[in-house]
Amino acid sequence: MCGIFGYCNYLVERSRGEIIDTLVDGLQRLEYRGYDSTGIAIDGDEADSTFIYKQIGKVSALKEEITKQNPNRDVTFVSHCGIAHTRWATHGRPEQVNCHPQRSDPEDQFVVVHNGIITNFRELKTLLINKGYKFESDTDTECIAKLYLHLYNTNLQNGHDLDFHELTKLVLLELEGSYGLLCKSCHYPNEVIATRKGSPLLIGVKSEKKLKVDFVDVEFPEENAGQPEIPLKSNNKSFGLGPKKAREFEAGSQNANLLPIAANEFNLRHSQSRAFLSEDGSPTPVEFFVSSDAASVVKHTKKVLFLEDDDLAHIYDGELHIHRSRREVGASMTRSIQTLEMELAQIMKGPYDHFMQKEIYEQPESTFNTMRGRIDYENNKVILGGLKAWLPVVRRARRLIMIACGTSYHSCLATRAIFEELSDIPVSVELASDFLDRKCPVFRDDVCVFVSQSGETADTMLALNYCLERGALTVGIVNSVGSSISRVTHCGVHINAGPEIGVASTKAYTSQYIALVMFALSLSDDRVSKIDRRIEIIQGLKLIPGQIKQVLKLEPRIKKLCATELKDQKSLLLLGRGYQFAAALEGALKIKEISYMHSEGVLAGELKHGVLALVDENLPIIAFGTRDSLFPKVVSSIEQVTARKGHPIIICNENDEVWAQKSKSIDLQTLEVPQTVDCLQGLINIIPLQLMSYWLAVNKGIDVDFPRNLAKSVTVE
Amino acid sequence: MEFYLSSDCASLARYVSKVVYLEDNDIAHIYDGELHIHCSKIGSEDFSFRTVQKLELELSKIKKGPYDNFMQKEIYEQCETTKNVMRGRVDAFTNRVVLGGLENWLTELRRAKRIIMIASKASFHSCLAARPIFEELMEVPVNVELALDFVDRNCCIFRNDVCIFVSRSGETTDTINALNYCIKKEAVTIGVVNCSGSSISRFTHCGVHTNTGPEKGIATTKSYTSQYIALVMIALWMSEDLVSKIERRKEIIQALTIVPSQIKEVLELEPLIIELCDKKLKQHDTFLLLGRGYQFASALEGASKMKEISYVHSESILTNELGHRVLAVASDNPPIIAFATKDAFSPKIASCIDQIIERKGNPIIICNKGHKIWEQDKQKGNVVTLEVPQTVDCLQGILNVIPLQLISYWLAIKKDIGVDLPRDSAMSAPDI
């Protein structure tokens, strides 16, 4: 949904212009995530002052706003922290006052950018208004900024000068919901706080010197000196007692420590991780990039660290400290620094007009990459390293539950039947949000498969945590290295599709489909009765990239169809049966999200249960009529359509006599695609629909890569 | 002697009350005032006789009465039909549910490792509506399957699976095919039907009759609510020996007893709905319906009714799937109808609806009486509310679907569509 970006430079001289450009460029790379307004916050001309620039619309509108405000770009900063945000409205419509960053007061004492939704913001807002705070916006984020100020002032009045991360802990105690949060304050110059719960957040590190260690220690508070619970509604007297007692305990604890070795060990680990940049402990020039997505960091550095839920990152004096906002038994003690593999060039459009078009045309390569090194066509074997150790457990599963949202859900539907056929294990396909709502029974001998292109989809993440709590084995099928789902599941498969920038998922769908088929094949490799079927499928997979290339040649024909038959239509019906039902649903979804046409995928045999009432000579209908065991029934359904003056577009196999004959006597058109194994045909059949969605949108003058109201990664539930 | 031959007993009711049902592969030969039944395949039948059964259909039940259309009559009959499905089965004093048709299979049913509910269209939606309460009360996995897709996929079925087949007519071809498949796999099968003597009621091991009475309108209305209640009763009955569910079962049983009168209350919304159809909805040909949790099924069923009867392209969406693409369509101002009755998901639903309002979606919200959260938006004209009584979350869908039935009906009337015989739909779908 929203995008967050922060940039901190320490002992690295940067002009204000360079800082602005870095922040704006970071937003540009997050723009696909949500874009109805943008903003940045940087240091002002006077000490302890802040400049905030924000504007409705795209990042380019923000650039214009900054140019108009004409800040002095030549002022240089040796150390500086700036934060930035691109917004997708959840509370308060897109208006300038609702843009982030949000501030605590007209003096900009605390400035916040925020991903997610604060579910108790109404109560907080009422409380803060009652304490005299005046709100400028309708956002839930402004509550956070004002809460910071309120807690800061209250503690100051009681004589407690809190550290920035200590203050943040108090703020977080009051928040319910999900958040990815950056905060900057004039009371803590050149410091920034980053914390997350449910929304992804990562930190990139850039320095001329080689990193000394590849991890950062998490700093836990002393056991008996944990932060006190200080409810906001308590009176001043009891409120003021907490921190003081905490310090007393801390002092006592130190005095009582009779184990010098343990103490030394603690100090050593502490200083070692904090000084991961420096050999001799001297200050080192360093830059930090905080972002909700690696795509905006990769240009600057490949060294990144992913925050976990409830992590609280405090960046100051060129150091990165990680605290926990609440303590957990068994929680990981370190956060590893990983190397991103994403190349900048991969993100750019190349010779195509839109990322979506580029990604559609990449499917011959992306499908090949999904299979590369994993399928042995000579010996008809499938090798999935990420699953290998777990396959015996999966084979003994009582049930397979596939859990996903949107397009990923359709890839599960597409492959469900082949899983059941090859493994003889019952398979459920669940929408993640519905699965959670129902609190579905999950047991230790269930295997749960989570499919997500970004690996960050909020509902899928929540469902994953739910299944982990119940002891199920969890498998992740994702396209992003280091994503939350890939790190939290027991095992998984990376689909290797490459970055997908276009909001509408295209190549990730086909890659997920293939990854799932390979998974099903792996499950069956010890079954004699499945040998012939497995060979058939594996050889069919081998041909898929070439066949997709062939289907892409239909583009001129499809472009013409979109300009004539389908132009100016408001509704569209897609019919599919068996394996092609998922293709119908996915095609309808693409058309809906990209060309804004109301389209619906229907199981062909369900026509007679009501849907046939819609059929007349005006309603465009697209039907999948490729060959498989259900072909005669599909033909029968389509005949019912044509008997009612419908004139469908049939996606059929090349040189199919049945459709050639029918097109002579009935008003219908055909799009011919190569024939492959029934369980793989959906990979071929979806391509014409992707192209159709694309050209319908282009012909309408719609911004294909950034459709309104949609985001690439749905990280709010 | 006179004989009447028919594919449906409705056309016989005015002439005779005694009937014989033919089985597959039967050949009936009528001559010299005699009826002879032969079998076209040797050994294909176990039964050597066909019983003469008595029809219970009353002619008067097939008349419209004071209503203009059968559909309207049947919508208004839901006060009585919901009462009838519970009559003699739900005891509010002892908080028990008695289902005679299932009694002999009690042991097998309670031993179930998995429950699979198989149906088509409106019956499929009643299964979706009841599914969460089955999972909650019985704590076993429940799959809901479209009959057609189920057969196409040759699903894995085992001996300790319990398969529930729901069909109004008891003759839906896809459902019968699925039933035959499950019997072959030795699963225990339950039929939930509205026609005694129908194929499904005769072939299943056991079942529950919904006692709804004849439904003449093509669009399923009263059958949906009756099926819903029948399924809830089955869940209550099967979970009777779980101590941990006593309070929940009691809560549901007490709520069931007042559902008929609550339906009567909802029907009082009709004037408001007529006005709404006139002013706001009539000119649109695309609708979005949003529901979450128990109300997802209500959204699906509502969308189905609107397609069948009003010929508008309506689609139901899980409310929290908004972020996954659907919101792109919302800003073109198709009418949006959202279910926002109180349950565990109310805060999240409110958040989603706020997002729609922010994009000038101007939704129609079906909410509970006395719900104040949208009062301000209502004053500003951003939303319209339809207020229904509040009941237990797993039964709320029975009340929530009725405004949608009325909307479908009145949209069709306003568009001058033949309500009882819409084009291209059939009461039973015996052919592929």
Curated annotation (Swiss-Prot), chain A:
Its EC number is 2.6.1.16. Gene3D superfamilies: Glucose-6-phosphate isomerase like protein, domain 1 (3.40.50.10490), Glutamine Phosphoribosylpyrophosphate, subunit 1, domain 1 (3.60.20.10). The modification Phosphothreonine is found at residue 334. Residues 2-318 form the Glutamine amidotransferase type-2 domain. The modification Phosphoserine is found at residues 253, 336. One of its GO terms (biological process) is UDP-N-acetylglucosamine biosynthetic process. Involved in amino sugar synthesis (formation of chitin, supplies the amino sugars of asparagine-linked oligosaccharides of glycoproteins). This is Glutamine--fructose-6-phosphate aminotransferase [isomerizing]. It comes from Saccharomyces cerevisiae (strain ATCC 204508 / S288c).
Curated annotation (Swiss-Prot), chain B:
Gene3D superfamilies: Glucose-6-phosphate isomerase like protein, domain 1. Residues 105-244, 277-422 form the SIS domain. Keywords: Repeat. PROSITE patterns: SIS. It comes from the Eukaryota. GO terms for molecular function: carbohydrate derivative binding; glutamine-fructose-6-phosphate transaminase (isomerizing) activity. One of its GO terms (biological process) is chitin biosynthetic process. This is Uncharacterized protein YMR085W. It comes from Saccharomyces cerevisiae (strain ATCC 204508 / S288c).
